[in-house]
Regions:
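Left-handed beta-helix
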Residues: 12, 18-24, 28-29, 229-391
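Conserved beta-strand scaffold positions in the cores of enzyme catalytic domains, especially
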Residues: 55, 106, 166-168, 288-291
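Extreme N-terminal basic, low-complexity initiation segments
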Residues: 1-8
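Conserved N-terminal catalytic core of the sugar/cofactor nucleotidyltransferase
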Residues: 7, 14, 19-35, 41-49, ...
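Short coil/turn connectors at secondary-structure junctions
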Residues: 28-30, 79-80, 102-103, 130-133, ...
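Conserved core of the sugar-phosphate nucleotidyltransferase
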Residues: 146-267, 288, 368-369
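Residue-level signal for inorganic ion chemistry
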Residues: 66, 122, 141, 183, ...
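A short acidic, often aromatic-flanked loop/helix-cap motif at beta-alpha or helix-coil junctions
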Residues: 112-117, 175-177, 205-208, 298-299
Length: 391
């Protein structure tokens, strides 16, 4: 079921004066970019290519992850400075959920080209509006529990960006996680809230992750970025000149009658590469990247097990997503379940524990919670079998 339209009164979007609640001096307001792509294959069959996870209410409220992301940005920016980059298949759903955004702030990518093309396009479009802008890029499908702490952390990143650094927001690790990439940082400097990023690290093996956490020098890479658009675009031109030239040409035509033709001609030629690989790793080697460590209850909602860890439970540790669904669920002598009833059928479970049960109109998933990461292999197999209608 799609969340109700997101009706935010403009009064909820704060002014510069209100930002004093978060920081000690007046700061410029961000341009916020929300890349909204990917299908969330570990959340199949709830999340599908045609209705990915960011459009679902996985927040414990009626708001979708995308809506929660926009609401979280209210102390940092305004609707006219908030841009969403999404695929053509999702434009209508994004517009329905984000009625407060101007139509022209939903940027459409004709096909997925990974994160660098999407973020670079937004940066280039913003640069045509304000060449001196500071922009932040924040994923559409993450959960953050402590919004005030997150806002303060982002504002510290803005200060670094104003000095010409390519900033990230790193997450202080709470466990030796093997499903995330890491940022290797330098030592803290007294009086400076950020640390230099020495290297971006791939997802590690368990023993390596444990060493990272023990070191105190490694943070989770949450793919949150803050920078001046001129600095980012200059770094993009240095490392990825073809991609830079492409998005610059698209941005030059943006808002003109030639926009669609230029976008359609150039977009398929852009390299398909993440912004980490394309820009940030090389910039870190050159000493141009810094990070602000954050501890604000971040979660990437990567699979159903994770969802079960962050949403409210009953006395037996069971999580039911969408408790308003009818006829709903009937759980007896069962514990530590994640149940997602989405078909209109009754879901009944008796005498089981540590399972994921997802019931949709055309597919049912049942698996142990500790196999949640492997759900994506089912999606891969369905694709191999040519059963794209299920994915």
């Amino acid at each position: 079921m799609e969340p109700r339209p997101f009706l935010i009164l403009h009064a909820l979007w704060v002014t510069r004066a209100t930002l004093g609640r978060y920081v000690g001096h007046d700061v410029r307001m961000l341009y916020a970019v929300i890349p909204a792509g990917g299908s969330g294959t570990r959340l199949w069959p709830l999340s599908r290519a045609g209705h990915p996870k960011f459009l679902h209410p996985l927040t414990g409220t009626s708001a979708s992850l995308l809506q929660a992301t926009v609401e979280r940005l209210a102390p940092l920016t305004t609707p006219d400075r908030t841009l969403v980059v999404t695929g053509a298949a999702h434009v209508a759903a994004v517009a329905r959920q984000l009625t407060v955004l101007p139509e022209e702030n939903i940027l459409v990518e004709p096909s997925p080209r990974d994160s660098c093309a999407a973020i670079a396009l937004a940066a280039a479009v913003i640069a045509t509006r304000d060449p001196n802008a500071v922009m932040g890029s924040f994923a559409a499908d993450h959960l953050i529990r402590d919004t005030d702490s997150w806002v303060c952390t982002v504002q510290e990143a803005v200060r670094g960006a104003e000095q010409g650094l390519l900033m990230t927001v790193g997450i202080t690790p709470t466990r030796a996680e093997t499903g995330y990439g890491y940022l290797e940082t330098g030592d803290p400097t007294e009086g400076v809230p950020w640390r230099q990023v020495a290297e971006f690290k791939e997802k590690p093996a368990a023993e390596v992750a444990e060493a990272y956490v023990r070191s105190g020098r490694h943070l989770w890479n949450a793919s949150m970025f803050v920078w001046r658009v001129d600095v980012f675009l200059a770094e993009l031109a240095r490392q990825q000149p073809a991609l830079h030239a492409g998005v610059a040409a698209i941005a030059a035509a943006w808002g003109t009658p030639e926009q669609d033709d230029v976008l359609g001609a150039i977009w398929p030629t852009l390299p398909k590469i993440s912004v980490d690989y394309a820009v940030m790793e090389g910039a870190a080697t050159a000493g141009r990247v810094a990070t602000v460590p954050g501890d604000f209850g971040w979660n990437d909602v990567g699979d159903f097990h994770t969802l079960g860890d962050v949403l409210p439970t009953d006395d037996a540790g069971n999580v039911v997503l969408g408790t308003e669904a009818k006829p709903g669920v009937l759980l007896r002598d069962s514990s530590n379940l994640v149940v997602v009833p989405q078909s209109g059928r009754l879901v009944a479970v008796l005498g089981l524990r540590d399972l994921i049960v997802v019931d949709t109109p055309d597919a049912v998933l049942v698996c142990p919670r500790d196999r949640a990461q492997d759900v994506k292999t089912l999606v891969d197999e369905l694709k191999e079998r040519g059963e794209e209608g299920y994915v």
